[in-house]
Amino acid sequence: MTKVRVRGIYATALTKIMLEDGYDIVQATDTILSRFNILHSTEPPDVTIKDDENIPGALFIIGKCSEVNKVLESILRRVGDVAYNKPPVPLYSVIMGVVADNGHIEVAPGVLALLEGSNYFRPGDKLPVTMVNVTGQLRASPYIMPTTSYLRVIDSPTVRLSRHIKDPDAKMMLVRVGLSKINQLGGLGIRWRSSAQYLSEEDAEKALDEAISLVNAIRVKIAEARDYDMLFEGECIVSVILDAEARWVLDDIRNTIVPTVKGHHALKITMKNTEILDYTEYLVGELKMRDELGRALANYALSNLSTINVHHVKVNGEHINLGPGERVHYSNGLLIIRRELKPGGTLDGLNVAKEYGDAAYSVINIGERHLTHIYVSHDGSFKGAYVNINTPIEVTWDGVIYIDLEVDLTVDKGFNVNIIDEDKLSSIPSRRLINEAEEELSRLKGDVVNLVRNHIDTLSKLGLSIHYQGP
């Protein structure tokens, strides 16, 4: 049976999904053990699910490739058709690459990675490399550095430990075992993974012996390897870009285990101290007012922020913080923030120069599938508007978050409408999100001028005088 370790803000909901689909939960936290009444297992996981450190609100799945795909399918069956990204090659895979120009190596047809130490090799050379980074810019090392359940081979003759290994006795034992055999790795070293903290000294020695044998076996394969042959599979990675609807599903699943407000997981994306959330959910258990208390907590979060972060997440995982911006208004789900723009360049989609004193007012309705940026000059003249189409806007503890859906509309100062990046819709890796973007675009494009004018009127009523020309 596949063994899964679950960590992060979605742990309770994901543990329930994994258990329902027959996976074994290993290395669970005390909270998860208590909530699900399961036995503690220290076995190493085949797959780990955790928060993605680079993409706010996303899941990061890593482990044995065949098992990662199964776990991904289990999650998608519950949360629906969401965007996810898989690197072209596994992490720590060992591949017979072909050295290319400009410091790169081709590790699969058309797939280039930066080659560490590229000055020592010539274009056309065949070279076994280990993929040491597969998210963002691919990077390959000319050292043979496979990974196992308990350790990873590294490119310097040292013994290192995962930061998750806390026990002093375990640390001393693992260092001792590592140093006793490190000379058998031919100039390489090891980094013990967190699962190694549960090993006895005898089992740690066996784990290291197996890693040494693995390195030697890979070296034997090199002589007969062809271009792009994978000499060691490594670990597959998937980043799952969760949007509001997926998070709401996970809120509901968690609510079957412990009282959970709607919006729980969005709030926790940037929440460091969960005491107020815990107390609110205690009240949910007592008063059964789940939706009302969830809205109240979201209102509390936004009402108490003087600056707002706008987490603009793209379907490829790129994260852009459009803040922090000054909160100038929040009431009944309507949030308005102000950002001063740096002079230089042009306003997105409008081809209008950004000048000294320009500002952007972002008009954000929580739960809506778009938000509008109103651009004004130093004297309050309307310079244009940019309407971003996105997934429903959610409240985080430090602002708001949404997934950008590529296509947008602009309205210039003469109230002429332009659709931009419509051709990028097909690049979204989710049919559901494409359909939602097309529906929102269709709904907006006939009414976007009225939408922008209404927003300008709203800003004027708040004392933010904005003037424009035109009918």
Curated annotation (Swiss-Prot):
Keywords in alphabetical order: Endonuclease, Hydrolase, Nuclease, RNA-binding, rRNA processing
GO biological process: rRNA processing
Entry-linked InterPro entries: DUF402 (IPR007295), FomD-like_sf (IPR035930), Ntdp-like (IPR050212), RNA-bd_FAU-1 (IPR016730)
Pfam families in UniProt: DUF402
Broad class of enzyme this protein falls into: hydrolase
GO molecular function: mRNA 3'-UTR AU-rich region binding; RNA endonuclease activity, producing 5'-phosphomonoesters
EC number(s) per entry: 3.1.26.-
SUPFAM superfamilies named in the record: FomD-like
Function: Probable RNase involved in rRNA stability through maturation and/or degradation of precursor rRNAs. Binds to RNA in loop regions with AU-rich sequences.
Family stated for the protein in its record: Belongs to the FAU-1 family.
Name of this chain's protein: Probable ribonuclease FAU-1
Species this chain originates from: Caldivirga maquilingensis (strain ATCC 700844 / DSM 13496 / JCM 10307 / IC-167)
